[in-house]
């Protein structure tokens, strides 16, 4: 194991942040700490994850949303102290790791299908038992 990787892993553990499991296509709500003068408040940024960059402590992700008809993209550092919390609102079914093509699309063309939860073996057995 590399010394730098070990230090990064220890730093991530020290931060103790709970990062939800998300992937591109998911709708994510990121609560960000915003400092305005002497006041500190939490601002929610909800949008679709269009890219995720996994680099240990330097991991980041890009969230895109449409605000008042204008597209807004924001890059977040995954382990940033500015992020108060993250929540996955909706899982998206996509076949790409980077969804940059959404930048060229608007309206219904920019929709993402919802990923349905996988059926477990137990559910299938119950469904078969219920059929006459």
From Swiss-Prot:
An example Pfam family from this entry, by short name, is Ribosomal_L19
GO cellular component terms, A-Z = cytosolic large ribosomal subunit
Highest taxon in the source lineage: Bacteria
Whether tRNA processing counts among this entry's keywords is no
- SUPFAM superfamilies, alphabetized: Translation proteins SH3-like domain
Q: Which GO terms describe its biological process?
A: translation
Q: Name one GO molecular function term.
A: structural constituent of ribosome
What are the UniProt keywords, alphabetically?
Ribonucleoprotein, Ribosomal protein
Role description: This protein is located at the 30S-50S ribosomal subunit interface and may play a role in the structure and function of the aminoacyl-tRNA binding site.
What PANTHER family does the record point to?
LARGE RIBOSOMAL SUBUNIT PROTEIN BL19M, RIBOSOMAL PROTEIN L19
Q: Which NCBIfam families match?
A: rplS_bact (TIGR01024)
**Which family does the record assign?**
Belongs to the bacterial ribosomal protein bL19 family.
Protein name in UniProt: Large ribosomal subunit protein bL19
Q: Which organism is it from?
A: Nitrosomonas europaea (strain ATCC 19718 / CIP 103999 / KCTC 2705 / NBRC 14298)
Q: Which gene encodes it?
A: rplS
